[in-house]
Structure formats: C-alpha cells, structure tokens
Amino acid sequence: MAEKQNYRIGVISDTHDRWKPRVAELFRDVDEIWHLGDVCHEPVLDELRAITSKLTVVLGNNDFELTYPPSLDLERCGERFHLVHILPRRMPPTDWLLFGHTHRPADEMHGGVHLFNPGSAGLANKGAPLSVGFLTRENGKKFRAKVILLER
C-alpha cells in the first residue's frame, strides 16, 4: 500500500450483533475499518461495508458462523499491525498489536509493542462504556491511537 501522509483507520470490536448508530457517523471519513472479532453475524459487517468497502475482519470466540482468519498481519504506511481477537501469550514481531475480547479499552506499550483495544461497540462489560477506536497518521508522522466513548 502506498504511503499516505494522512491516514485514518476505524477500529471496532465486540459488536455482538449490535452497535450504536453513532459509529457510522464517527467512521464516515475513515480510509478503512478493522473489526477485531465477535461480530456474531454477517449483517453487522454489511452495515460497516456501507461506510467503506475497505473492511478487514478477524474472528472472535463467538463468531461460529463466519469464515474470516483468526489473526492478520498488515502493514500501513511503514508500520506493522497484528490483528487478533484474544491477546496472545507470546508477542508477535510487530509495531502494533490490536485486540478485542475484554470489552475494555486499552492503549499501552509493552516491550516496544503498542497494545490497543478499542473496547466493545455493542455489549458493555462490567461497567466499561461502549467505545470504538481510531488509528490516525497525520503529516507523515507515526500512527496514534485514540478511544472514543459512544455513551457516557
């Protein structure tokens, strides 16, 4: 993929067959969307494809009827991304490890790898608010992560 000076990726996880209409509004100007699993049924992905045809999906532990890979390694603008639903025991060689499953947002560094979880967009868990994430590259700089709460 050619390097772009500005690039924006919408990151979503754990929709569990539902998500807030606000997600479509937040994601309307993204270059692509990454879903980190627990979609549960294909119609959710059809709604995301209506926002952008550039949709990447990995399987979650509740995606029994779907046929997507359990993990993916991608490169965008010179940075490496590993997408998976459940955080692996061993860190793969990557710059970013994106995961879901916990339904709780996370944004931290571990051993030189940026760990990012956008939280859950569809099913709240133990008081964590519904949320989505963004990876944004501006003016050719490295990607930065941000979590957006869908409700307060």
Predicted regions, residues:
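N-terminal active-site segment of His-dependent metallophosphoesterases
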Residues: 1-55, 63-70, 128-131
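Active-site neighborhood of phospho(di)ester-bond hydrolases with catalytic His/Asp-centered motifs
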Residues: 11-13, 32-38, 56-61, 82-85, ...
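Residue-level signature for short turns and capping positions that connect secondary-structure elements
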Residues: 16-17, 88, 121, 150
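Short, conserved loop/helix-junction motifs that constitute active-site signature segments
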Residues: 48-52, 76, 110
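Conserved beta-sheet core of the metallophosphoesterase superfamily
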Residues: 77-145
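Helix-adjacent hinge/juxtasegments
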Residues: 54-92
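Short, solvent-exposed aromatic-acidic interface loops
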Residues: 144-152
